[in-house]
């Protein structure tokens, strides 16, 4: 009986360790810290400025993360101090995300990147209209006047060479 409990506990620990936690948070903060000049890495105000500048160009999940921490003008609340101060102390981004931000707003660590589509096997005709619109949205494109599924598929096929990198 105790072996069974131990085995189940081990499986749960391994499964939770395999799933990346706070992946969007870590990536955004890593990108931001790479942009911060070496002389400003210990200044919370300078880090905050770089975060806000970086967040102006983000889309999708990264933009949602920026909204949650208050780095966007339209954000309702701001927890930027919970981000900038620990980063100025050289705290690792993973620790900032898991220990500081997750406690303030659990939604931050629930953000996950969408799995990339396998363009070699995907059948656009079998996808729902909402999924097709999401593909265009991820690319930052819109299909004005598209009311039919076939029109969305046509637009995706037109833009596919621009956004989908074919592997050799």
From Swiss-Prot:
SUPFAM superfamilies: SAP domain. Pfam families: ARMET_C, ARMET_N. InterPro entries: ARMET-like (IPR045333), ARMET_C (IPR019345), ARMET_N (IPR045332), SAP_dom_sf (IPR036361). Changing residue 75 to L: In dma1; results in up-regulation of ER stress response protein hsp-4 in the intestine and pharyngeal epithelium. Elevated expression of hsp-4 is suppressed in xbp-1 or ire-1 RNAi-mediated knockdown animals. Expressed in the intestine, spermatheca and nervous system. Expressed in the hypoderm. Expressed in structures of the excretory system. Not expressed in the male gonad. PANTHER family: ARMET-LIKE PROTEIN, MESENCEPHALIC ASTROCYTE-DERIVED NEUROTROPHIC FACTOR HOMOLOG. GO terms for biological process: ATF6-mediated unfolded protein response; developmental growth; dopaminergic neuron differentiation; neuron projection development; regulation of response to endoplasmic reticulum stress. One of its GO terms (molecular function) is sulfatide binding. Disruption phenotype: Animals are viable, and despite a delay in growth rate, appear healthy and have a normal lifespan. No defects in the axon formation or guidance of dopaminergic, GABAergic or serotinergic neurons. However, there is an age-dependent decline in the number of viable dopaminergic neurons under normal growth conditions. Up-regulation of ER stress response protein hsp-4 in the intestine, hypodermis and spermatheca. RNAi-mediated knockdown results in up-regulation of hsp-4 in the intestine and pharyngeal epithelium. One of its GO terms (cellular component) is endoplasmic reticulum. Disulfide bonds join 22-109, 25-97, 55-66, 143-146. This is Mesencephalic astrocyte-derived neurotrophic factor homolog. The gene is manf-1. Inhibits endoplasmic reticulum (ER) stress response. Retained in the ER under normal conditions and is up-regulated and secreted by the ER in response to ER stress and hypoxia. Following secretion by the ER, directly binds to 3-O-sulfogalactosylceramide, a lipid sulfatide in the outer cell membrane of target cells. Sulfatide binding promotes its cellular uptake by endocytosis, and is required for its role in alleviating ER stress under ER stress conditions. Has a neuroprotective role, ensuring survival of dopaminergic neurons during normal growth. Belongs to the ARMET family. It is found in: Secreted; Endoplasmic reticulum lumen. Changing residue 146 to G: Does not rescue the elevated expression of the ER stress response protein hsp-4 in the dma1 mutant.
């Amino acid at each position: 009986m105790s072996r069974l409990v131990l085995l189940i506990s081990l499986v749960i620990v391994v499964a939770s360790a395999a799933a990346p936690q706070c992946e969007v948070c870590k990536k955004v903060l890593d990108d931001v810290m790479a942009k911060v000049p070496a002389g400003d890495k210990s200044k919370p105000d300078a880090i905050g400025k770089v975060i806000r500048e970086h967040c102006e160009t983000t889309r999708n999940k990264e933009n949602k993360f920026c909204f949650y921490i208050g780095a966007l003008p339209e954000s309702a609340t701001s927890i930027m101090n919970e981000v900038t101060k620990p980063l100025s102390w050289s705290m690792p981004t993973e620790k900032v995300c898991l220990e500081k931000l997750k406690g303030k707003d659990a939604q931050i660590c629930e953000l996950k990147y969408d799995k990339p589509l396998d363009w070699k096997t995907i059948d656009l005709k079998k996808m729902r209209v909402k999924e097709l619109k999401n593909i265009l949205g991820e690319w930052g494109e819109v299909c004005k006047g598209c009311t039919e599924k076939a029109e969305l598929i046509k637009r995706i096929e037109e833009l596919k060479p621009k956004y989908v990198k074919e592997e050799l």
